[in-house]
Amino acid sequence: MIDQYKHQQLQIGLVSPQQIKAWANKNLPNGEVVGEVTRPSTFHYKTDKPEKDGLFCERIFGPIKSGICACGNSRPSGAENEDERFCQKCGVEFVDSRIRRYQMGYIKLACPVTHVWYLKGLPSYIANLLDKPLKKLEGLVYGDFSFARPSTKKPTFLRLRGLFEEEISSCNHSISPFFSTPGFATFRNREIATGAGAIREQLADLDLRIIIENSLVEWKELEDEGYSGDEWEDRKRRIRKVFLIRRMQLAKHFIQTNVEPEWMVLCLLPVLPPELRPIVYRSGDKVVTSDINELYKRVIRRNNNLAYLLKRSELAPADLVMCQEKLVQEAVDTLLDSGSRGQPIRDGHNKVYKSLSDVIEGKEGRFRETLLGKRVDYSGRSVIVVGPSLSLHQCGLPLEIAIKLFQLFVIRDLITKRATSNVRIAKRKIWEKEPIVWEILQEVMRGHPVLLNRAPTLHRLGIQAFQPTLVEGRTISLHPLVCKGFNADFDGDQMAVHLPLSLEAQAEARLLMFSHMNLLSPAIGDPICVPTQDMLIGLYVLTIGNHRGIYANRYNSCENYPNQKVNYNNNNSKYTKDKEPHFSSSYDAMGAYRQKLISLDSPLWLRWKLDQRVIGSREVPIEVQYESLGTYHEIYAHYLIVGNRKKEIRSIYIRTTLGHISFYREIEEAIQGFSQAYSYTI
């Protein structure tokens, strides 16, 4: 499928029976229409040729050998007549054999069958639209009870509507005699409905716009009721409101995509192209076949048996017909999802058959293993490690990966700057790792973002853009704050790096995919770049401090204030066990730490700016100390105020640790950097 932007894409959804026929049907020159698979056979046991109207029929799916029909003939050279595209004898079209990779067929089901994905999936789309319990619908689909059609003015056997089992307990006994009568078919077509046909009738009668209007009215009524005080009733009301919202969204989606609800019940079952479910002959007459073929055979056999019974409905008991319809439903369920009916179907070697769902889903499914897990050009892969010195929008690329990814750009710049004369010499310079190569590589990387992806990509934050920087080693460095979006940690996780080439891809990476542009979760809106694990432990250790009581008085508290700096080069008396040092600035405290005079959690007094008040409106000092000259010291829980006799504050000291100082400085620098960047944008 190709969209309006000429992008190839794959879409899974519901299609009409007419579309299924259009995919498969071909008109032969003699007026015959082929496309329906009616026989469960595959290849003839003597000729090893596909059986006509079977699962590998050449008339339906195309020739096995390009341009050669089943008879062994080829199209005459120079033939341009439309009728000469087909063999007059066998009806096989003279086309390339690759058509067997995409040409589909179909099975015309003798009775409607519900699609198991839409009936038993969570949530059940059929149950949501019909607003009925899933168990009741399953009982109706598998023939446990019947549904009475709307009664008319004409005389009828029953004048009921709804589910027999629910409304009248004796209905099963009252209609059971009709099951064995010759006129059961007439009675059933006019009076009752059972199986998937009953579901199809109810879905066809739905008006999606009325469903949206009625659901909205009911939701508003529940919203206006408020809380009743009964926990159980409030819980049921919340569940009902969520269900109504889900039902309105589902109906709106059906309207927007022009999909009819009754398409969830199948009348025609598509048959995959034969090349996607091959049969392989090995030495020793051993045959290896896809499990899908065996499941298709099972469906065709049961469907043919049901068609035979319906043709002879006057002789066949009604119970037998209903039982055969149930078998057809179960066979289609097994084909689509083998585990939907409890225990999966097994072959003679006790091996579980792989259904279509098993082929598609999971890590080894068609999408993740075949389509998404392939190597592509301009990409690399390596283990991720933490890069604490990186900015949020940066990642560290190893030299080996970077030179491989940007090799063509480096060669172009080497030739442009006349450092080399041709590509061969440029590659030699790169191989010899000359200094000019690294200079040009850094210039190229400075203006070119890269994409990092961690599988599985479950949401859009699984792929983010970063500004690459060169690092030593063979691992990719990553800022720890972006790990939550990737659901990654540093215990051996691997990430793939991709290089956007076109200008459109680079612009999209810069405007939409950069990590600093994705700070909130797209699902719930909460911050997703938050500290976790090692960062929280590091912040805790950095700011835990030493839980020691206040030890400050006029004999040891402020011997070096107001402007005298601490002489931390003197190791004699300033930093004893009983004295908490005073520092005029954070730089003095950092200098003392570098000289190992204090530790990260050592309590200290740091002189604070007078314009940054730290006094609470209701906080009172623990103790007030006065000196002979009128100077006083107000000691609080975490700070100290020094004033003169005129009640003027001369200095303020806060009681903190070096860890708190370091954390404060980092936060302050980050805020200042953000403010500068914001002012530049304005």
From Swiss-Prot:
Keyword Ribosomal protein: no
EC primary class: transferase
Listed GO CC annotations: chloroplast; DNA-directed RNA polymerase complex; mitochondrion
Keywords: Chloroplast, DNA-directed RNA polymerase, Magnesium, Metal-binding, Nucleotidyltransferase, Plastid, Transcription, Transferase, Zinc
Main location: plastid
Keyword Chloroplast among UniProt keywords: yes
Compartment list: Plastid, Chloroplast
Record-given protein name: DNA-directed RNA polymerase subunit beta'
Organism encoding this protein: Agrostis stolonifera (Creeping bentgrass)
Lineage: Eukaryota, Viridiplantae, Streptophyta, Embryophyta, Tracheophyta
